[in-house]
UniProtKB/Swiss-Prot annotation:
Transmembrane segments: 34-54, 78-99, 114-134, 179-199, 227-247, 289-309, 321-341, 348-368
Cited PANTHER family: CYTOCHROME B (PTHR19271:SF16)
Residues binding heme b b566: 98, 197
UniProt name for this protein: Cytochrome b
């Protein structure tokens, strides 16, 4: 009998082992759909971004006009732009849910997969930040100024580092040019990191909602999970297209409809919604360096998750106290997101400070403590 090409061809064999004949736990829920949704988000963003880059001019005098031209004169340019801008929001919704699922079900115990995942998150955040600067509106310009300026808080080399990043003494043409170059490069880095992420994942295989070994009950990825993923794609593209067609500016900032003006500061500088939780933590500390360290810690704290896992059970499925703590953390993140969008005045300042303390306390103190308590209650 002739060998099956899918199983013998050097390239097809890799695809087959990752997407077709991959043994998959039979009980993984819809929470396991977000990995493939992130993949489809990345592909959509690269495609729409490539089409937008063909009509974009990375120059301070022309950037804003070139985007207006894309939306008005290019065939379906408005749609491509709206899909790209709102696609970023969906990318972050998916990645936050993906991380939440990993945290809830103890997937961070696959250390390499978890760590590459955090690197992916950081790269995605960098990509979204430099991308937000490209339209060269008011919020683009001032957002870039405020956030890049934070590097000046680094002792001794800070100021030099900022001027080196800017390519001058303020955010100007060189900054825009290099940000465009970075925004083009980083998604391909994300694609490369994704392959590493998947390689590490397939070393151990997927986790499952029970957090137990599933070798005794595996099913092939295709057709079961390919079909399930296609359903996921449909359920994501529906709200994305609805948002892009009916309310494309809902998640943006009205300030960005005004071309960048270095002489006029917007009344309230704030990033896109997906950075607001970190922005709230940054603002809650009255010291510049302290704020920057807290901002970095808000994401880098995820690296500690495997070390802080004290429970004898992997998932939170059968741990009601830890579940309560998890949902408290989720609520706390919503509060931080809301605070980040508010002006710096009473009572928002104190709420932000309390929410920031709570965020780190839950992750670093309460989770390990409650896990140890649950072990004791279960006589482990």
């Amino acid at each position: 009998m002739a060998p099956n090409l899918r199983k013998s061809h050097p390239l097809l064999k890799m695809i087959n082992n990752s997407l077709i004949d991959l043994p998959t736990p039979s009980n993984i829920s819809a929470w396991w759909n977000f990995g493939s949704l992130l993949g489809i988000c990345l592909m959509t963003q690269i495609l729409t971004g490539l089409l937008l880059a063909m009509h974009y001019t990375a120059d301070t005098t022309l950037a804003f006009s070139s985007i207006a031209h894309t939306c008005r004169n290019v065939q379906y340019g408005w749609l491509i732009r709206n899909l790209h801008a709102n696609g970023a929001s969906f990318f972050f919704i998916c990645i936050y849910l993906h991380i939440g699922r990993g945290f809830y079900y103890g997937s961070y115990l696959n250390k390499e997969t978890w760590n590459t995942g955090i690197l992916l998150l950081l790269t995605l955040m960098a990509t979204a930040f430099v991308g937000y600067v490209l339209p060269w509106g008011q919020m683009s310009f001032w957002g870039a100024t405020v956030i890049t300026n934070l590097f000046s808080a680094i002792p001794y080399i800070g100021q030099t580092l900022v001027e080196w990043a800017w390519g001058g003494f303020s955010v100007d043409n060189p900054t825009l040019t290099r940000f465009f170059a970075l925004h083009f490069l980083l998604p391909f880095m994300i694609a490369g990191l994704t392959l590493i992420h998947l390689t590490f994942l397939h070393e151990s295989g997927s986790n499952n909602p029970l957090g137990i070994l599933s070798n005794c009950d595996k099913i092939p990825f295709h057709p079961y999970f390919t079909l399930k993923d296609i359903l996921g794609f449909t359920l994501m593209f529906l709200p994305l297209t609805a948002l892009a067609l009916f309310s494309p500016t809902l998640l943006g900032d009205p300030e960005n409809f005004t071309p960048a003006n270095p002489l006029v500061t917007p009344p309230h500088i704030k990033p896109e919604w997906y950075f607001l939780f970190a922005y709230a933590i940054l603002r809650s500390i009255p010291n510049k360096l302290g704020g920057v360290l807290a901002l970095a810690a808000s994401v880098l704290v995820l690296f500690l998750s495997p070390l802080l896992h004290k429970s004898k059970q992997r998932t939170l499925t059968f741990r009601p106290l830890s579940q309560l703590l998890f949902w408290l953390l989720v609520t706390n993140l919503f509060i931080l997101t809301w605070i980040g969008s508010q002006p710096v005045e009473h009572p928002f300042i104190i709420i932000g400070q309390l929410a920031s303390i709570t965020y780190f306390t839950i992750l670093l103190v309460l989770f390990p403590t409650i896990a140890a308590l649950e072990n004791k209650m279960l006589n482990y």
